[in-house]
Regions:
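N-terminal helix-turn-helix DNA-binding core of bacterial DNA-binding proteins
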Residues: 18-62, 84, 88-97
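Amphipathic alpha-helical dimerization/coiled-coil segments
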Residues: 2-22, 40-44, 94-138
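Short, hydrophobic-biased segments on the C-terminal half of alpha helices
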Residues: 70-71
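Short, Lys/Arg-enriched C-terminal cap helix and immediately downstream tail that follows
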Residues: 77-79, 85-86, 101-103
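Alpha-helical residues within the helix-turn-helix
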Residues: 57, 74-75, 80
Length: 138
């Protein structure tokens, strides 16, 4: 038997808020392995950045393909390109990355910042120890 469908029983699509749309764009960009690798490579090369050619060589990808990935990351506000002479040097947009992390954790610990103060205390410190890929599996 088919249930009666009423206007009240149909979920109405609501577009994401501008903040949610920005986060979705960033996660869509990072949801592709090569782009995630590019962002991680650019973080390593902060604050100087590296050229498209250097990125392409490091990730073993054609330069035009790499440029396409960089354009997607730039639209997601995760990388910044700046012209230096005849080259474009790319850097991680650390403000954009920070925004994304802050968006994810905006309501952390029911809005009590003191409860999760140490959540990122070890990031970017000499004591910071990132688990190897094998360790992360268990």
């Amino acid at each position: 038997m088919i249930e009666d469908v009423t206007a009240d029983s149909i979920d109405v699509y609501e577009p994401p808020s501008p903040l949610e749309a920005r986060a979705l764009t960033a996660f869509a960009a990072l949801g592709q392995q090569t782009r995630l690798s590019i962002l991680r490579l650019l973080v390593v090369h902060e604050p100087d950045g590296i050229t498209v050619g250097e990125i392409a060589q490091a990730i073993q990808s054609p330069q035009n393909t790499t440029s396409g990935h960089l354009a997607i990351l730039a639209r997601a506000q995760l990388v910044i390109g700046s012209r230096q002479g005849r080259s474009v040097v790319y850097r991680a947009d650390l403000a954009g990355v920070r925004w994304l992390i802050e968006y994810l954790f905006a309501d952390c610990c029911n809005g009590d910042p003191s409860a999760c103060r140490n959540l990122f205390a070890d990031i970017c410190t000499a004591e910071c120890s990132h688990p190897s890929e094998q360790e992360q599996l268990y």
